[in-house]
Amino acid sequence: MEPIVELRGLSKTFGSGAEQVAALQQVSVSVEPGEIFGIIGLSGAGKSTLVRCINLLERPDEGQVLFHGKDLMTMSTKELRQVRRKISMIFQSFNLLEQRTALDNICFPLELEGVSRAKAKERAKELLEIVGLPDKANAYPAQLSGGQKQRIAIARALASDPEVL
């Protein structure tokens, strides 16, 4: 079976000269469809950099990022945008839009995909049920606890039914 995500020899450095820091050095990972794969490590170990390289939010200095066997590094901007719709990320900082309700935050990625407002709201309500927050649909991020914000971020990441989360 072909891996859904494969990273081959990824390296990423930040800074230059004496200030240069190697965040990733020749990292290779293969994740099969349906596989649960976790990345753990100490603070500053490069976990976030590695995850951001999966959809090229962070471009590695060298190596390959493959999705269904296709190299993301060689894709056009349009092709990469289409692949990114199939890969969702849940970041430690929630990145919720403060001026939008919980429901509207979950609808946001669907709106970007051109889904009708009615269908987006229906999907968002389903996801609020799944994450156990159906009563928070009209709450703004400032009215939510940290755990509730994280669950809204999870629901938002699931909204597009991604192949990789």
Residue ranges and their predicted role:
Residues 2-165:
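ABC family nucleotide-binding domain
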